[in-house]
């Protein structure tokens, strides 16, 4: 847990404060007290029968199902974690060893933000910069308004509503938040979230109103 938190909270895309001051705070305080609290929280959601976190399990299942759907022996589908294991660097090395020459990177964040999608791009570039082998590279930066994505979200909501015997007053589309100063600097994430909600409202087969809400990151930034 401590190693994961150190990697995550040392990312300059995630924490945009003076790095010297932040490293003191991080190493003296946060990494001293936070790991034990985080471990307790993880213990509550840990999938003991799979011996993995829900994030790892569902990401692995997404990768497997996409592989089955593509069903092409010449296309390798794999996954990596931005922080922790399996790392982006290790997976790129594995793909190189398999003889891959064309690399498509799909960050699993529909709405682009510098603290999520951009840091994945950073790590991909860093990994490739240390290698002599260079594949052709395509990164899918965001897909908040892709028709297939909107259709899938609408179907998921419709299926859930059909299984309950009462009608909700409202549907809340909840997203992670980002510090306001990131938005003020030009991060488009907030706009993409509202765009996704609008498109869901326009395409979903229900008269229930939909609103956008944001969950704030635990962050020293306003």
Per-region residue spans from a language model:
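N-terminal glycine-rich anion-binding loop in soluble enzyme alpha/beta folds
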Residues: 1-76
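Short helix-capping segments at alpha-helix termini
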Residues: 70-73, 128-134, 165, 203-207
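Conserved small/polar residues in nucleotide/adenosyl-binding loops
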Residues: 217-222
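Hydrophobic alpha-helical segments within soluble ligand-binding/sensing domains
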Residues: 147-169
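Redox- and metal-dependent alpha/beta enzyme cores, enriched for Fe-S-associated oxidoreductases
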Residues: 180-212
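Short, structured patches in soluble enzyme cores that scaffold and shape functional sites
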Residues: 107-109, 139-142, 157, 173-177, ...
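An alpha-beta-alpha
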Residues: 164-189
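Long, hydrophobic, well-ordered secondary-structure blocks that form the structural core
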Residues: 78-152
């Amino acid at each position: 847990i401590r190693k994961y938190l150190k990697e995550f909270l040392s990312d300059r895309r995630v924490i945009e404060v003076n790095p010297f001051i932040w490293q003191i705070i991080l190493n003296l305080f946060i990494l001293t007290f936070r790991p034990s609290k985080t471990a307790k929280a993880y213990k509550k959601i840990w999938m003991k029968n799979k011996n993995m976190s829900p994030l790892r399990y569902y990401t692995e299942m997404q990768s497997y199902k996409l592989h089955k759907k593509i069903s092409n022996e010449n296309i390798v589908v794999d996954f990596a974690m931005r922080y922790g294991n399996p790392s982006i660097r290790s997976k790129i090395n594995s793909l190189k060893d398999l003889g891959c020459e064309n690399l498509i990177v799909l960050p699993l964040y529909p709405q682009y933000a510098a603290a999520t999608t951009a840091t994945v791009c950073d790590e991909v570039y860093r990994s490739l910069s240390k290698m002599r082998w260079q594949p052709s590279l395509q990164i899918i930066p965001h897909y908040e308004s892709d028709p297939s994505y909107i259709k899938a979200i609408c179907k998921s909501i419709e299926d859930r509503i059909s299984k309950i015997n009462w009608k909700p007053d409202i549907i809340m589309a909840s997203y992670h938040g980002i510090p306001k100063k990131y938005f003020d600097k030009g991060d488009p994430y907030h706009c993409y979230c509202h765009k996704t909600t609008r498109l869901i409202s326009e395409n979903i087969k229900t008269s229930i109103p939909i609103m956008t809400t944001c969950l704030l990151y635990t962050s020293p930034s306003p």
